[in-house]
Amino acid sequence: MTFRHSLAALAVLLLSAALQADEAKPVDATPKMAYGLMMKQGDRLIFSPCRDRSYANVEDVSADGSVTRVLNSVGLDAGKRLYVELLGVLDNGTLKASAFNMARVEGRCQMPGGKEEAWRAAGNDPAWALVAGGEHVRLQRYGKPEVVLPYAEFRSDGNISRYDGANDHARLAVRLDKTICRDAQANGAFAWTASVELNGQILKGCAWQR
């Protein structure tokens, strides 16, 4: 065998080994949050990730198809395009969704909150919004001063997460229950139901993780 033939044979062996390594590479089975737009085409559920031109089929692997039921309640089955945040595993072009964080009709992409945001919550009558993460918990209410308290990681007890904070002027208690919350004004559904108590006033709404 000539030197040239030896190099060619070695190249074939290396290429074969690389292909086998790629084929043997296991799928990361750790569920991660997927952010993107979702629609139904015939019997298929199509997911398009934020800031990405790729597409993936969606397979609902949640218990009793709970993810699909929630999305259909927002309008997926009726042909509406949704912005969704789904917990799942991407496997060979299929997003296997096991849980949902939020879904809104024609909503815009929201990238992960990172270190600055762990939770968001909002409600109506009266209008309010809460952002928790980083160094602060901020509560905004229509026509009233913003309340800012030091952030501390929410305490988890089963399907309930809590936060308590206070300063010289405000005492705040936040309770988040992992039960589906629907907001007709926001045209969406969220994975958590929020109850916020500020100096004895109770505010109700929905919450989602960031």
Question: Predicted segments — roles?
Answer:
Residues 93-113:
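OB-fold/S1-family single-stranded nucleic acid-binding modules
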Residues 50-64, 121-175:
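Central antiparallel beta-sheet cores of small beta-barrel/beta-sandwich binding domains
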Residues 1-8:
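Bacterial N-terminal signal peptides that target proteins for export
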Residues 29-45, 88:
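Structural detector for short beta-strands of small beta-barrel domains
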Residues 36, 75-99:
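Flexible glycine-rich surface loops and low-complexity tracts that mediate binding to linear polymers
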Residues 92-95, 183-189, 193-200:
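Short, exposed beta-strand-loop hairpins at the edges of beta-sheets
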Residues 30-32, 67-71, 111-115, 120-127, ...:
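Charged, amphipathic alpha-helical segments
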Residues 8-16:
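Bacterial N-terminal signal peptides
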